[in-house]
Amino acid sequence: MNNSDLGKAWIEDLGKNSPMIAESNGPTSQEIASGSRPVGVVVDYLVRDLADKGSPVALAYPTEGSPYISEPAGVFKDSKEQEAAQKYINFLLSKKAQEIAVDQSYLPVREDVGTPAATPELADIELMDQDLEKITKDKDAAVEVFQKAVSS
């Protein structure tokens, strides 16, 4: 919300285009795959999967920046299985697990495992600056602006 290029004005302009708001990426990706919608904002692996199946879609990463969310994982501080949970996190971050992620068309968090076919290296994708504390603080106001913009 505090970005002059991608903040409130951008969201309000988006709302003027009557976007389809779906509860998940699946319906949006199917809309663009069928040609019912000319563009959609979805997780990148879905576009790669659709293209691999012959759908006439192309993936574009915004030059203004893309969010980077790759298989989030964490350990609850009050977990009774701290050691097991940490071992699982360590596995998820291992070279072997990240190679599996790449094979499943996900962008890895490691730089030594490559990327899915026809996907740029992570270093070549402009990523958004994500201040998680600020995002959390601004969440309610951002949701309100978004809901107002897309429901009018």
Model-flagged regions — what are they?
Residues 45-48, 64-67, 80, 94-98, ...:
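Solvent-exposed loop/turn segments at secondary-structure junctions
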Residues 1-2, 70-81, 100-101:
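A bilobed periplasmic-binding-protein/Venus flytrap-type ligand-binding module shared by bacterial periplasmic
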Residues 1-64:
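Ligand-binding pocket segment of bilobal, Venus flytrap-like solute-binding proteins
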Residues 88:
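Substrate/cofactor-recognition hotspot
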Residues 118-152:
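Extracellular/periplasmic bilobal clamshell ligand-binding domains
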Residues 5, 22-26, 34, 41, ...:
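Soluble non-cytosolic domains of exported or imported proteins
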Residues 91-115:
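Periplasmic-binding protein-like
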Residues 55-67, 76-79, 117:
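Short beta-strand->loop
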